[in-house]
Amino acid sequence: MPPTLIVDPASVDLSQVVADREAIRRVNPQRYELEQLTAIVLMDGEQHLIAGYKDVGAEEFWVRGHLPDYPLLPGVLICEAAAQLCSYYIVSTGLLQGDFLGFGGLENVRFRSPVRPGDRLLLIGKGTRMNRRQTIFNVQGFVGATMVFHGDILGVPLHRQEDEPAQEV
């Protein structure tokens, strides 16, 4: 059984763009193939709500190899798109002590229906825990009125230190 809706997807006005791709780039560091958001269409600072969408294209890098006869948006990219949505919210509202929000983990994630080229994936997130060390967002994804994905995204603040090389873990 699907979870209770964070927000009814039919109530989200997709024509009311709060941030287009260029505005998203000013906040989120992902580029090229890993830019997973097309637009942000809702931000509510009082309820810690955000909604945005990804227009799934037929020429994306994964289409050729992820089930060539029946291309499906990989679940990991759905999760990445949701994480980018949450990161945009945290950074643009100034709730983060860092340069960007890094992927901290996933909990309770379920995929309920496929997402295919030509679909518009609407993502809705609600911040349920936000502090200096960690954020947790409940997220849901829809194609039309169909819930295709839900789960919890954990984020951690990261600082870019351009003069230090990456360290092995």
Please report, for each region that a protein language model flagged, where it lies by residue.
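Catalytic strand-loop segment that frames the active site of acyl-thioester-processing enzymes
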Residues: 30-73
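Hydrophobic core residues within well-ordered beta-strands of beta-rich domains
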Residues: 34-36, 121, 135
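Hydrophobic beta-strand-centered segment that forms part of the acyl-chain substrate-binding groove
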Residues: 2, 9-18, 86-124, 148-150, ...
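Residue-level recognition of beta-strand microenvironments
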Residues: 43-45, 114, 128-130, 156
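Compact, glycine-rich, soluble single-domain proteins
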Residues: 64-74, 79-88, 103
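Flexible, low-complexity linker/boundary loops enriched in proline and small hydrophobic residues
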Residues: 2-42, 155, 164-169
